[in-house]
Amino acid sequence: MIKELMNMKEIKNGVWPVMITPFTADNQIDYDAVKAIIDWYVENGVAGVFAVCQSSEMFFLSKEERLSLAKCCIDYCHEKGVGVVVSGHVAEAVEDQIAEAQAIIDMGADSYVFISNQFGAPEDSEEVVKERIEYLLSRIECDSFGIYECPYPYKRVISPELLKWIASTGKFAFLKDTCCSLDQLKAKCEAVKGTALKIFNANGATLLESMRMGVAGYSGVMANFHPDLYAWLCEHYADEDKQEMVQEMMDYLGAASTIECQVYPINAKYHMNLVGVPMTLVSRTKNPELLTCGVPVKCDGDAFPSSKIMEIDQFCAVEKIMRKYFFG
């Protein structure tokens, strides 16, 4: 295990956005916008990027698109000096999963991230999951893996007991946790103590308390809206002289995180335009009219934007107020 830990790339503490995929008007991946998003992440203090995940609409990308997107993100993140972990673990056949994982690893990802629900059907026991993880590890050449408790097509939350075993393999460095339970997070932090496996919380409301328990940072939807605010919290959560501001930031981030229940990821794509990262609202998972209601985003004359568009406009305005309050 010592040799494996020496070869494992560092997964830095902090913010790891779940990267959205921008598309052109004719529904192709917009690689110029992909790079612009990464630039924006880096400018806003992220530790790394989680690419080709559910927010990336990976279930709606072809194999060729998943691999092409992975290579673009890996190469550009390396160029920008920021970490990158990659999934794309959606193939049905296990041998196809192995081949695709190896291809992404060979591109230079810091860690290849398995989807936990791909380890077995909902009714399968954790013993079955262990056997399947062991098989994958025996077939894939890689020093660093991760796991994402992806909620689609069903959510398989890793138990603290299983996580302890996973960490003991010495092969895992990253867990994107979606349990949203402080009791479970506390037990999971205990389970990985003293190992290389770091837990990243996907839930905004529980983030502060979970970091006090040992969680390494945030990897969730809201890093597509204000990664800088999450980065500030991750950096200062333990500062004794800032605890009042830390709690105020947490209160804002927890309340603001409810916007992900609106029309994500389309609202995130619209928000990107508001902060200077242009892209279409095209998505393969939702109709943009769920956000726009068929009304042009920029209205002239007697037309008015949809209420959901106005919500994101107002959301962005409040973000600016919060930045002024916290950063001056």
Predicted regions and their residues:
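Structured C-terminal cap/extension of enzyme domains
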Residues: V42, E209-G328
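Catalytic alpha/beta core domains of metabolic enzymes, predominantly
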Residues: Y135-D143, C150-Y264
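A local structural micro-motif
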Residues: V49, V85, Y112, F174-L175, ...
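Repeat-unit-sized solenoid/scaffold elements
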Residues: V113-K130, K176-V192, A216, C299-K308
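Active-site beta->alpha loop and helix N-cap motifs at the rims of alpha/beta catalytic domains
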Residues: I2-V157, L291-G294, D313
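Short alpha-helix boundary/capping motifs
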Residues: L69-A70, R132-I133, G194-T195, Y237-D239, ...
